[in-house]
Amino acid sequence: MLTLFFSLISLPYAPNALEPVISQETIEYHYGKHLQTYVDNLNKLVAGTEYESMPLEQIVAKSQGAIFNNAGQILNHNLYFMQFSPVAANNHLPQGAILEAINRDFGSFEAFKAEFEQKGTTLFGSGWVWLSADKDGRLIISQETNANNPVTKGLKPLLTMDVWEHAYYIDYRNRRAAHLQALWQIINWDEINRRYAE
């Protein structure tokens, strides 16, 4: 019997709670099938290795090849899915420390959003666009291809948007930019502030 070192995270919302921004069907495929496959693969790959007892962040920082790809995708998706809350929630605008940092480093929230969306729209192929903080708390927007994550560069990931086609094709078809613009409606800025403060 396979030992489970990693398991699928529990979502803090119902599968239909992010509609109409992200449909229940997309959640069922993206979370229930894609992410579950990465978890299953990683459990098989790390069995009997030094990685089986490491936290995901360490595996991503130290591994290569298939272990890195699957661990990276789990870490990326965990951060992605846990940053959302239903459209009806009242926490979808940044405030506090993260808003101060956004204004300091990008000039305004609108300027930050424009740069973030531009980086997400222009990333060639599959990957992620990230807002991260460096060791001094400065904010950085980066494009990361495939399973890459800013932790490999010594940064603290705060917010991400998935630009792999499986993240948006059911709901938006080839309209990646529309998908990115819509996601702001479900970002839980309380969670982003918590990550920034860690």
Per-segment meaning from a language model:
Residues L2-E198:
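Feature for soluble, non-membrane regions of globular proteins
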